[in-house]
């Protein structure tokens, strides 16, 4: 399997981005006037294809590959977040830890906004289904608050 990670990010102030803030009451109240960074990372469609091939021959290998994929995409996101954190701290600001849509009280629908705002489908091949699943499956969207 030859797959390199892909990432996209965008720094914005949600108060200036009325269409983004208007999509979610939670976003309007939590991030009003706050600068944020949208993040998206993936290990690519090749991983999904490799995992499908494994599932035909061995359920155990398919299960192990699931964990490998999760660990790999988390590493991609950790590295992207660290890169942004260094830049933000160089400006004398602080980056709060990333939060992904669907965890806690962050609405799952925010993934759709992040994908759109980052143009992630065109830029890195990440899209979202009608039921809000990311494709390729080992992809992550997130938001970090800058303070």
Locate each region found by the language model.
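Generic detector of well-ordered alpha-helical segments enriched in charged/polar residues
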Residues: 15, 51, 65, 85, ...
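Short terminal or interdomain "cap/linker" segment that borders an active site or interface and mediates
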Residues: 91-147
